[in-house]
């Protein structure tokens, strides 16, 4: 299964209108035919990164399905979407991603109905890491062998998915880690105090063997996002 990761730079003051357009116009277009399904719609939490930005992650059955989806872009309904979208957003940056072998997120049932979260919208930590040249596979393996068990033990975050960029569709040395925030008070303490007093030998130390550059964003799920 493929995952299309899109970052939408929205026109100032148009974020609510853009979200509604994605929900009512774009999502039905993408999901028509059963080859693809919107998984998450996130907005950047205010004050944590760029202004007026949204991120979507869409599951696509396989490369043949992706080809069919691209071929439909010339249809009248898709052209109408394009005209509407460019009144609401300035740019969109996309990449096709594949699940890491150990990633909890693998294939999903494209026909299954969305499950209601039954609570407030979830908050996610969206980490993008850039491993050293030639270290991509080692970095991904270390995330699964060291970092993933560490999060399971601490229960502050739940790793939902680990995705790598499909060849030819974006930056080679790039990994996206999707983590749902389960314990906000502890995370707020981490923001306030950093890693002071944390035991040595954990991921913050071991991870430097594979990369020393990463970017973190706090994302808030839309209330209507199919997955929370």
Regions found by a protein language model. Name each.
Residues 2-15, 101-184, 223-228:
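Surface-exposed interaction/gating patches
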Residues 16-40, 46-51, 59-100, 145-160, ...:
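An amphipathic, aromatic/His-enriched active-site/gating alpha helix that lines ligand/cofactor pockets
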């Amino acid at each position: 299964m493929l995952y299309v990761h899109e970052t939408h730079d929205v026109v100032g003051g148009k974020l609510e209108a853009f979200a509604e357009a994605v929900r009512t116009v774009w999502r039905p277009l993408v999901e028509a035919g059963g080859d693809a399904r919107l998984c998450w719609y996130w907005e950047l939490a205010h004050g944590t990164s760029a202004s007026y930005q949204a991120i979507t992650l869409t599951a696509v059955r396989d490369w043949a399905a992706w080809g069919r989806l691209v071929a439909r872009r010339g249809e009248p309904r898709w052209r109408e979407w394009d005209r509407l979208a460019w009144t609401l957003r300035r740019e969109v940056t996309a990449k096709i991603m594949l699940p890491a072998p150990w990633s909890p997120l693998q294939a999903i049932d494209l026909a299954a109905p969305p499950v209601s979260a039954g609570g407030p919208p979830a908050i996610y930590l969206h980490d993008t890491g850039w491993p050293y040249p030639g270290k991509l596979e080692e970095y991904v393996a270390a995330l699964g062998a060291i970092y993933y068990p560490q999060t399971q033990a601490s229960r502050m975050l739940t790793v939902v998915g680990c995705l790598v960029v499909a060849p030819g569709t974006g930056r080679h040395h790039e990994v996206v880690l999707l983590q749902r925030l389960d314990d906000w008070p502890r995370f707020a303490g981490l923001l306030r105090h950093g890693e002071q007093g944390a035991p040595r030998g954990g991921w913050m130390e071991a991870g430097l063997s594979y990369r020393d550059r990463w970017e973190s964003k706090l994302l808030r799920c839309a209330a209507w996002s199919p997955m929370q």
